[in-house]
């Protein structure tokens, strides 16, 4: 789970810089609720829990960062590619980058 904690900290730092007030609080709540559901599904289906937690964490990451839901799936995917960088294998990255 080291990769998860590193990415979580980076995402929270981005939110501190780019998002504010109620919108930021709602985004953080949504992010962690979806992450929790992803981990529960991973446990139930025997999937990689760390990878699923990260998918939940990043699934809508662009919405609070850009303060817009316009093309949020594509924008979140692009932002996730930047955040994930070289720490994930190509096999792992393909699960997140489904919308491209």
Model-derived segments and their meaning:
Residues 1-100:
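Metal-dependent phosphohydrolase cores
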